[in-house]
Amino acid sequence: MRITALLALVFLVIGFSFGQEQYGNIRGVVVEKDGAPLPGVTITLSSEKFSPRAMASTASGNFRFINIPPGIWQLKCELPGFKTYIQRNLDIRVGNNFDLRIVLDIAALEEEVTVKAVSPIVDTKKVGISTNVTQEMLQEIPSARDPWVILQQIPGIQMAYENVGGNFSGQQNGFISKGSPISEAMWNMDGISITDLAALASPFYYDFDSFEEMDIVTGGQDASIQTGGVSLNFITRRGGNRFQGMARFFFSNHDLQSDNRTPELIGLGYSGNRINQITDYGFQFGGPIVKDKAWFWLGYGVQDIRNIVITGFPDNTLLKNFNAKLNLNLFRNNRMELSLINPGKTKNGRFAGPTVPPECTENQNPLSNFYIKLEDEHVFSSNLLLSLKLAYHKNGFELKPQGGMDVQAGYDVVTGMNSGTNQFFSTKRPGYSVNLDGNYFRENFLGGNHELKFGVEYRLEKNLEYTKCPQDVWKYYWNGEPFAAEVDREGNSETQGQRLSFYLNDSNVKGRLTLNLAVRLDIEKSVVNESRIQASEIAPEILPALTINAFDPGFTFYTFSPRLGFTFDLTGDGKTMLRGNLARYGSQLGSYAASHVSPGQLSYAGYYWSDANGDGRVSKNELLGYPYEGLLWFSGFDPWNPTTLESPNAIDKNLKSPFTDEFLLGLEREVFTDFSIAAMFILRRNHRTYFYPLYDKATNKVFTQADYIGPYSQTITSDGRTYNIEYWTLDTYRPAGKIMTNRPDYYENYTSLEITATKRLSRRWMMNASFSYQIQTAHFGKNGFDDPTNIKILDGARLLAEGWWGSSDWMAKMSFLYQLPWGFNVSWFANVRQGFMFPEQVVVQTPERADVGLGADVYIYTARPGEKRLPLHYGLDISLTKDFRFKGYGMLTLVVDAFNVLNLGIVQWRDTLATSPTYNQVQEILNPRVVRLGIKYHF
């Protein structure tokens, strides 16, 4: 059944779902001194910022306030004949739960009892691993002011690149956590998924000051979350019953920067990675339109980031962001929200680096980006809440090569150096989301109290991509000498992805034990839409023009994901919790998945190239054996049937979603008020991953390791080093296609111990510290590979999860804030980790593989992953601020931040290709110490 048809049925029959947490909750019971429950107590929840809520306690004395916006609240309990009870300073945070036991005393006269709330540092219902990022953490801890830097502060998360004072804020940073790659991350904003399904990444960049809080989950996700990857939920600011606002200006430049170049770097003539100038400015403002009925919020921010890469080339980024929100409480027990975000990114010099000169960099421009969301929430009773969320986003950008489209692009296989120019790329990614969320509470049912969160989510996203190589040619050199060339045909592919999700969570409280039972079902598809492609400029005979009709590849994912979690109060006072979780997670299917079988994908064929006239340009008569006899490699088309509208590739009709299985067991203890320590043991296994072996569609034959012959051996000598390598080839010429299927026998094991210490801001100080030790290995089994090349050295070794980064076995982090007298505040963030892997390789020419269409060269690992590493990494950032408070007129804050305080020149990357003349040369170092000056005004 098609997802769209099933969607309509689901909304009619079920109409419930539970989205990513964007609120906090208060639960409790009202009793007399002897413990007898008090029904009918009028309980009012109020704050200076939001409209009040009220309810009456049940026959069992229970009460619940759910979906409470973050902030400071007051709880008032009234019943004739009893003293009025007032609890102030209830500090509600995203995803946190207050469990209150309120005792009312009999009163002869009308009296009030007022107490100050103590927020629990240990959440008695949390089964997973999550971090609530408060305003203090966002604004007071020194950072480059983007979400990816906040991720760096979270326990167990490793980032690909170090962001020193904002030098990397113009680009999405890679990250990995607990064995899950960045492609499994779930991006959410105000309770609805915003993940870009074409890139499986964030859909845009953000104004950092638009965030009220963040909630980041790295393990033990409930059934509202599809994958086991990092789940981020951004809670954005909204207006309240008093006018509030803030403005900021931050500045740093080369005059505020040190020099950390080593003699090695100076000897190479490198300038070092540096900031030229960064400015960050903007405002946020909101308040009431009608008190207790309607509120607004507006914001605008700019980050102008001008960097110098290690070779002295410029890399400049301009981020602009406008955000607006309207909140309405027009009817009793009903809330509405309309929000809009208009982000934009312009970047000149993308990809600049030691192997990418300016002419090969790209200039990026946005293509009409915006995001809009409408939410309506209604509380039908104290036991039932429903919320409908509708969202639409339109993302897009284009990349134009600085070298232009009239020059042929080149790449040196040995040195890694790019030359000439680069390809043109553009993408548009419109998408829709619908969530219908529900929350239902049932007392004294099946031996306990049950809180159900349940429902349905639907997402549809299109992915329109166009890729064009200049003159439809790509040149390849071998250490400066002409080697091979690739003739290309533009890629113009439109795919569409859909996901329909059902999920149910039951939180069941029985005394000290809380059980969380959950199930989730995801139904996912990807289809190909109509498109047209032009013939190759240089090779129209084998790469002609095509008109592609829309078609369905015929596969659908039905992924069932059960979850079971528990917490147990070991001491009975809510201060020592044993937690556990057992879960299976599916993987999110990219909207692009069907492009594997689209004839509209970028297609190419490779040949040996002899530059006969020495002009450095490829012409067809210089391609040896063109078009068929000399074919070395190809992709995206059938060379022997070039006009067919059917791709030689296939997608297995039995293709399933990859799985991550998880087991967590942990202990958390409140040591003293506002301070806790925790330890968590984590086991994970990733399996049923994707696999793309060679495939002959005519015979339905999938090529396996039995079709490969070898090994062929070579002894390579480079700069006095000798390497004995081996590789395999086919016993016959390769087929035209590849099949997308599941990899049999292959799995990845992840084991970790994570220790954290958390001190919430009180008594003038705050701290978050963590230590993680982890091991992740890859296992191919008997049938988990086709080409045996490199398998012997990779099997059972450390996993090269993202190529090299994210591969540290251990890491430690600490953020700290202390409020000094006279309005001064000092804070810092320190981190240390094992150096990333140094995956050394050699590249060799392989005529045996070239003869069967597997390519003219191959890269061979020379050491098991993890045997060689980059140096230990450590860093320290410090901030000093001074607050000036003006009674009735807000607060002015002066800021001095220092990043990489120790001015370390730690190497971030070296050339790993042992056969290259630049082997082991520095390609990236840590940016030097830089001071950032800032001024902020709050009211």
What are these regions (language model features)?
Residues 311-313, 421, 447-573, 623-624, ...:
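Signature of Gram-negative outer-membrane beta-barrel scaffolds
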Residues 18-128, 132:
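Periplasm-facing N-terminal accessory domains of Gram-negative outer-membrane beta-barrel systems
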Residues 160, 530-561, 565-741, 855, ...:
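Solvent-exposed loop/turn elements at secondary-structure boundaries
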Residues 524, 670, 678-839:
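Gram-negative outer-membrane beta-barrel transporters
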Residues 82-105, 109-238, 257, 264-270, ...:
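Periplasmic N-terminal accessory/gating domains of Gram-negative outer-membrane beta-barrel systems
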Residues 244, 273-346, 364-390, 562:
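Transmembrane beta-barrel wall of Gram-negative outer-membrane proteins
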Residues 588, 674, 687-688, 692, ...:
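C-terminal beta-signal and adjacent terminal beta-strands/loops
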